[in-house]
Amino acid sequence: MLILSRKKNESIHIGDNIIITVVDIGGDNIKIGIDAPKNVQIFRSELLKAVEQENKNAVSSKSVIQDLAQLIKGDEKKQT
């Protein structure tokens, strides 16, 4: 991991088309601005972790697995 120090209004360039700028510093918070092409996806890591956990919970739920098994059995009956 590369660690850089930046002051307010200073930027970091990543590649040819991504610019990260320190917009504001206050207390424990730092506001950053990200200028990137629309095809570059930018997500907050805590949101990705929450979605990942919800997906794991949904898949591990017995009722979901039972529902899927019923759907598969129903499809097999229709095909025979």
Curated annotation (Swiss-Prot):
Alphabetized SUPFAM superfamilies for the sequence: CsrA-like (SSF117130)
Protein purpose: A translational regulator that binds mRNA to regulate translation initiation and/or mRNA stability. Usually binds in the 5'-UTR at or near the Shine-Dalgarno sequence preventing ribosome-binding, thus repressing translation. Its main target seems to be the major flagellin gene, while its function is anatagonized by FliW.
Record protein name field: Translational regulator CsrA
HAMAP family linked to this entry: CsrA (MF_00167)
One term of GO molecular function: mRNA 5'-UTR binding
Disulphide-bonded residues: none
Family: Belongs to the CsrA/RsmA family.
Subunit: Homodimer; the beta-strands of each monomer intercalate to form a hydrophobic core, while the alpha-helices form wings that extend away from the core.
Keywords for this protein: Bacterial flagellum biogenesis, Cytoplasm, Repressor, RNA-binding, Translation regulation
